[in-house]
UniProtKB/Swiss-Prot annotation:
Subunit structure: Heterodimer of an alpha and a beta subunit. The beta subunit determines specificity for ATP.
Site (Important for substrate specificity) residue list: 65, 133
Binding residue positions for ATP: 69, 76-78
Transit peptide: 1-20
GO CC list: mitochondrion; succinate-CoA ligase complex
Family: Belongs to the succinate/malate CoA ligase beta subunit family. ATP-specific subunit beta subfamily.
Protein's UniProt name: Succinate--CoA ligase [ADP-forming] subunit beta, mitochondrial
Reactions mediated catalytically: succinate + ATP + CoA = succinyl-CoA + ADP + phosphate
Source species: Caenorhabditis elegans
Free-text comment on the cofactor: Binds 1 Mg(2+) ion per subunit.
InterPro entries named among the record's database cross-references: ATP-grasp, ATP-grasp_succ-CoA_synth-type, ATP_grasp_subdomain_1, Succ-CoA_synthase_bsu_CS, SUCC_ACL_C, Succ_CoA_betaA_euk, Succ_CoA_ligase-like_bsu, Succinyl-CoA_synth-like
GO BP annotations listed: succinyl-CoA metabolic process; tricarboxylic acid cycle
Residue ranges of domain ATP-grasp in the record: 32-259
Length: 435
């Protein structure tokens, strides 16, 4: 519920690589419904788009203990905060009236978590579920492992907490089992996993059956991640999946049309939608230095070196290996869409398949179309690099070339600081470069 696995295998840097895989994340309540379709036990729940409906759902569910969960596509909800002042996107309450009150504070407000930017994401609906009293909680997930090129089970006897913290402080509590995709999870393997997770003897059979069904769900929905945190034994000896995080492979949209119809476009960043339409891998971040790079690994290294020199990247943007002039121009338009935020741009291209002269043409076209006033530092190496340098040199634009990445990062951070200082004091700054 609180901690989430970073794909793959607890590698926290993978959050910047998500667009390369292009996955679809479904809301928790959709995941819970899919669990039910596979005859997996979940707590009684309902979904509401307003406070009155939340009250009605609580009355329908019955009982005296409820959990109200904000439905936003971001991790860290439990420790998040709302623009309405409410602390926490997961609230435990005891009456339908309290359900109504908390839902009213969530719906329509923005939830800011460690996985959102400073604006957060708007909560359009809440999930109301019956609070079950558990005696033991476990962590279970199936994801894709690049090392074995197949599914892998990652599980733990410690659930309901941040699994990355468990991996760091008590790695022996983590169970990792690669799965042969040609065989899947057999009854015997499911039982072995349940035993290693530490289920009580009375619950081993139930847990084994759920693990088998979760693999069927993973495969049947073309998922890249099925995560249950926690999977729990209740006081009556029943095993439940208390929540569900489900990521689907966008390459399978053609055969998972019903699931992809569940996509919540309102939760997607408008710039990320534009980037995807242009076949660009883009994630908006909170910094001030725009980045345009080819290759996810080089893009992450570029962001690291910007931070090393005291700057903050405004985005992750991988133009890929076959970008056109039009794509490069669109990339600049996306980077500079928030004109009051981005104060400098670093272009870092290592031309292999990607030709540096194409990048240069795109930079020049974008700088002219957008009449860019902010400094642009360009580091180009590789295929057609001399042609690219010649294009930039004859463009009569104030683009700052730099062959050394470390020096380029230092330069863009200094220039960004100058622009930020000028903006803070309401002073216009113009950069001149001797030609």
């Amino acid at each position: 519920m609180i901690g989430r696995i970073s794909q793959p295998l607890l590698n926290t840097s993978q959050k910047f690589m998500a667009p390369a895989a292009r996955t679809l994340m479904l809301h928790e309540h959709h995941g819970m419904k899919i669990l039910q379709n596979y005859e997996i036990k979940v707590p009684p729940f309902g979904v509401a788009q307003d406070a009155e409906t939340a009250f009605s759902e609580a009355k329908r569910i019955g009982g005296k203990d409820y959990v109200v969960k904000a439905q936003v596509l971001a991790g860290g909800r439990g420790k998040g905060r709302f623009s309405s002042g409410l602390q926490g996107g997961v609230q435990i309450v005891f009456t339908p009236d309290e359900v109504k009150q908390k839902a009213g504070m969530m719906i329509g407000a923005n939830l800011i978590t460690k996985q959102t930017d400073h604006r957060g994401k708007k909560c359009e609906e809440v999930m109301v579920c019956k609070r079950l009293f558990t005696r033991r909680e476990y962590y279970f997930s199936i994801t894709l492992d690049r090392n074995t090129n197949g599914p892998i089970v990652i599980a733990s006897s410690q659930g309901g907490v941040n699994i990355e913290e468990v991996a760091a402080t008590n790695p022996d509590a983590i169970v990792k089992m690669p799965i042969d995709v040609n065989v899947g999870i057999t009854k015997e393997l499911a039982h072995e996993i349940a035993v290693k997770m530490g289920f009580s003897k009375d619950c081993e059979q139930q847990a084994s059956e759920i693990i088998e069904k979760l693999y069927q769900m993973f495969k049947g929905s073309d998922a890249t991640l099925v995560e249950i945190n926690p999977m729990a034994e209740d006081v009556n000896g029943d095993v439940y999946c208390m929540d569900c995080k489900l990521l689907l492979d966008s390459n399978a949209e053609f055969r998972q049309a019903k699931l992809f119809d569940l996509k919540d476009k309102k939760q997607e960043d408008e710039l990320e939608i534009r980037a995807a339409a242009a076949n660009l891998n883009y994630i908006r971040l909170d910094g001030t230095i725009g980045c345009m790079v080819n290759g996810a690994g080089l893009a992450m290294a570029t962001m690291d070196i910007i931070k090393l020199h005291g700057g903050e990247p405004a985005n992750f943007l991988d133009v890929g290996g076959g970008a056109t002039v039009e794509q490069v121009t669109e990339a600049f338009k996306i980077i500079t869409a928030d004109k009051d935020k981005v104060s400098a741009i670093l272009v870092n291209i290592f031309g292999g398949i990607m030709r540096c002269d194409v990048i240069a043409q795109g930079i020049i076209q974008a700088a002219r179309e957008l009449d860019l006033k902010i400094p642009i530092v360009v580091r180009l190496q590789g295929t057609k690099v001399e042609d690219a340098k010649a294009l930039i040199a004859t463009s009569q634009l104030r683009i700052l070339p730099c062959d050394n990445l470390d020096e380029a990062a230092k330069m863009v951070v200094k220039l960004s600081n100058i622009v930020d200082l000028a903006r803070a004091t309401n002073v216009d700054v113009k950069f001149e470069l001797s030609i």
